C-alpha cells in the first residue's frame, strides 16, 4: 500500500487500528514513534524561516486532507503529532498524513 496515493476519509464512529496494523504502518515511516495514542516526529531545521515554511506547507496538506496535526513550533524544529480524536487513537488517516509530511520534508 502506497500511503502517498491515498486520501483521508471521515472517521466518525470508527475504531482505532489494531496494534499489529499500527506496527506494520509505523515501519514504513522512518523516525516516527508512537507516544500514547499519537504518531509523533520532530523535524529539525536550520532556522526559524525554514521551520515556518515547513509548518505552512504542512498546514496546506492538512487542509487538503481535512486531517490536522497538533504541532509544537520552535525556532529550529517542529514537533508533529497525528491522532484521530473521533476514533480515540490512530487510524489510517494518521499514517497517510504522516507519509505526506515525510514527503514534504524530503522534497528537494
UniProtKB/Swiss-Prot annotation:
<dbReference type="InterPro" id="IPR001533">
    <property type="entry name" value="Pterin_deHydtase"/>
</dbReference>
<dbReference type="GO" id="GO:0008124">
    <property type="term" value="F:4-alpha-hydroxytetrahydrobiopterin dehydratase activity"/>
</dbReference>
<dbReference type="GO" id="GO:0006729">
    <property type="term" value="P:tetrahydrobiopterin biosynthetic process"/>
</dbReference>
<protein>
    <recommendedName>
        <fullName>Putative pterin-4-alpha-carbinolamine dehydratase</fullName>
        <ecNumber>4.2.1.96</ecNumber>
    </recommendedName>
</protein>
<dbReference type="Pfam" id="PF01329">
    <property type="entry name" value="Pterin_4a"/>
</dbReference>
<dbReference type="InterPro" id="IPR036428">
    <property type="entry name" value="PCD_sf"/>
</dbReference>
<keyword id="KW-0456">Lyase</keyword>
<comment type="similarity">
    <text>Belongs to the pterin-4-alpha-carbinolamine dehydratase family.</text>
</comment>
Amino acid at each position: 500500500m502506497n500511503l502517498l496515493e491515498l486520501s483521508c476519509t471521515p472517521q466518525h464512529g470508527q475504531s482505532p487500528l489494531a496494534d499489529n496494523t499500527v506496527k506494520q504502518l509505523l515501519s514504513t515511516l522512518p523516525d516516527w514513534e508512537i507516544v500514547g495514542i499519537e504518531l509523533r516526529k520532530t523535524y529539525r531545521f536550520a532556522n526559524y524561516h525554514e521551520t515556518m515554511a515547513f509548518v505552512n506547507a504542512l498546514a496546506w496538506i492538512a487542509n487538503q486532507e481535512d486531517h490536522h496535526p497538533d504541532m509544537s513550533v520552535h525556532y529550529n524544529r517542529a514537533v508533529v503529532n497525528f491522532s484521530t480524536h473521533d476514533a480515540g487513537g490512530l487510524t489510517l488517516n494518521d499514517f497517510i498524513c504522516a507519509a505526506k509530511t515525510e514527503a514534504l520534508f524530503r522534497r528537494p
